Amino acid sequence: MRRRFEVCALMGVFALVMSCTGAIATPRDGAPVVGEWNGLHASLTLTESGGSIEYDCAHGGLRAPVEPDNAGQFTVAGVHFRDHGGPVRIGEVPDSMPAQYVGKVQGDQLTLRVIVGAETLGPFTLKRGAGSRLLKCL
């Protein structure tokens, strides 16, 4: 009888730990990820309608919300702008290119790659609420 109680109690604790771990490890399927995500060489701001990103010598925008699947993975179309040193000239048209923002969310960590044509930027490891460390073009 005592053995049966111990096994049941252990199974209950295991189920509780597994359910909490899953809730922390990845967001709910389809729920938009929002907030400030920062790290070395990148700063990402996500909203319920899309987002913006700033890199050392570039910036960009996400045209849709980040809605990870059950595994925490996502792909969002957007735009990428190459920056340059010095001021922006009057009438200057930014150098924009289509981009795919591909990543994975695990708890308070987001890993991001940005695909621009044949070039892949990253991976960037970003943490929710952390400070960013950007080295802007001069």
Annotate each predicted stretch with a short phrase.
Residues 27-43, 133-135:
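Tryptophan-anchored aromatic micro-motifs
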Residues 40-82:
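N-terminal glycine/threonine-rich, aromatic-flanked beta-hairpin/loop signature
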Residues 20-25, 60-73, 109-138:
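Edge beta-strand at a domain terminus
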Residues 1-3:
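N-terminal secretory signal peptides that target proteins for export/translocation
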Residues 8-19:
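Bacterial N-terminal signal peptides
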Residues 44, 63-67, 92, 97-105, ...:
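Hydrophobic/aromatic beta-strand elements that line small-molecule binding cavities or substrate pockets
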Residues 31, 38, 47, 60, ...:
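Residues that act as N-cap/strand-start positions at coil-to-secondary-structure junctions
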Residues 76-102:
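An anionic, turn-rich surface loop/hairpin at beta-sheet edges
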